[in-house]
């Protein structure tokens, strides 16, 4: 099936890029926990609102890693294709073996397009995202630009219509900063698997794990194991 071949190709490509990216890098390993809430709320047939907050902590919650908030406006072509433009606020904190010098805020403009499809008992989601990132560091502000590709597959358990498994792969590609091309083309790679429960009203919860490779421009890298606990609740204001 087409989506399966895409996933295999992407995994192979990312594996090769990861192996190259980790050569001669100082790699640190951490354990994190991300607590997340998402919503896509339909206002009309064409328009909706995206809401998101992620409470990212070190360990199981001991200290801050990152606080992330996103809001956006959705435009729906139909129930399986929609685009979003929005704003994100992210505060990053010093943590772990390779801490940043001081906490800083990021203001992010982002655009994305999502497609959804079914292949037998498998449900596929593809997300294509662009980000324009204003990094307000104490040492000076800068702009960075990034592209992201996300593919997720989910499978409903037999005779258990409310339970389903999901897995995703996401690659983060650095485009350029204000003056120069980035020297770490692959900035992040994420691989995740989770078990999910969905109520009849569409609200769902997720518990899973994430393997994150974070590749920095200074020659360092992080390999992080992360617990994921998420809630998705979509509101529908259409008549």
Give a label for each model feature.
Residues 31-33, 65-67, 105-109, 141-147, ...:
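Residues that define the transmembrane beta-barrel architecture of outer-membrane proteins
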Residues 51-55, 85-89, 126-132, 167-171, ...:
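Transmembrane beta-barrel strands of outer-membrane/channel proteins
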Residues 45-51, 80-85, 120-124, 160-164, ...:
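Repeated loop/turn-to-beta-strand initiation elements of outer-membrane beta-barrel proteins
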Residues 16-19:
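N-terminal signal peptide c-region/cleavage motif recognized by signal peptidases
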Residues 37, 70-71, 111-113, 149-153, ...:
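Membrane-embedded beta-strands of outer-membrane beta-barrel proteins
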Residues 23-77, 82:
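Start-of-domain marker
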Residues 41, 75, 115-117, 155-157, ...:
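Residue-level signature of outer-membrane beta-barrel architecture
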Residues 110-113, 223-239:
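Outer-membrane beta-barrel "beta-signal"
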């Amino acid at each position: 099936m087409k989506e399966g071949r895409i996933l295999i190709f992407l995994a192979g490509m990312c594996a090769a890029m990861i192996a190259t990216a980790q050569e001669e890098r100082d790699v640190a390993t951490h354990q994190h926990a991300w607590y997340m809430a998402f919503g896509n709320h339909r206002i009309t047939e064409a328009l909706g609102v995206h809401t998101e907050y992620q409470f990212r902590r070190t360990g199981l919650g001991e200290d801050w890693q990152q606080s992330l908030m996103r809001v956006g406006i959705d435009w729906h072509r139909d129930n399986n294709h929609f685009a979003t433009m929005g704003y994100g606020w992210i505060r990053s904190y010093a943590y772990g073996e390779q801490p940043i010098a001081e906490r800083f805020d990021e203001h992010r403009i982002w655009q994305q397009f999502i497609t959804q499809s079914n292949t037998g008992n498998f449900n596929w989601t593809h997300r294509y995202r662009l980000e324009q990132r204003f990094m307000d560091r104490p040492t000076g502000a800068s702009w960075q630009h990034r592209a992201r590709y996300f593919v997720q597959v989910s499978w409903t358990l037999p005779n258990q219509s409310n339970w389903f498994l999901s897995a995703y792969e996401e690659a983060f590609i650095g485009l350029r900063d204000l003056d120069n091309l980035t020297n770490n083309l692959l900035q992040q790679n994420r691989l995740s698997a989770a078990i999910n429960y969905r109520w009849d009203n569409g609200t769902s919860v997720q518990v899973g794990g994430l393997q994150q490779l974070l590749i920095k421009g200074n020659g360092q890298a992080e390999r992080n194991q992360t617990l994921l606990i998420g809630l998705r609740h979509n509101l529908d204001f259409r008549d």
